[in-house]
UniProtKB/Swiss-Prot annotation:
It comes from Demansia vestigiata. This is Kunitz-type serine protease inhibitor vestiginin-3. Residues 1-24 form the signal peptide. Residues 31-81 form the BPTI/Kunitz inhibitor domain. InterPro entries: Kunitz_BPTI, Kunitz_BPTI_sf, Prtase_inh_Kunz-CS, TFPI/VKTCI-like. Serine protease inhibitor.
Amino acid sequence: MSSGGLLLLLGLLTLWAELTPVSSKDLPEICKLPKEPGPCRSYLLYFYYNSVEHKCQTFHYGGCEGNENRFHTIEECKSTCAE
């Protein structure tokens, strides 16, 4: 392979490594759950970990059911899920 081809391959591999998201395999299971507002009708502001965007975000929790990917503060979300 020519040196130009090797440089192109190296550049593509570097770009791929930079753009590939960090694996979520090391995240606690609750952080992989989708946000789940539940069926009730309260309008409570909570935080959840968005495992696609790799960050904590707000959502409105209905006040019942839902799942464990629900935190009162962004600090609690980050300390549990943020990498």
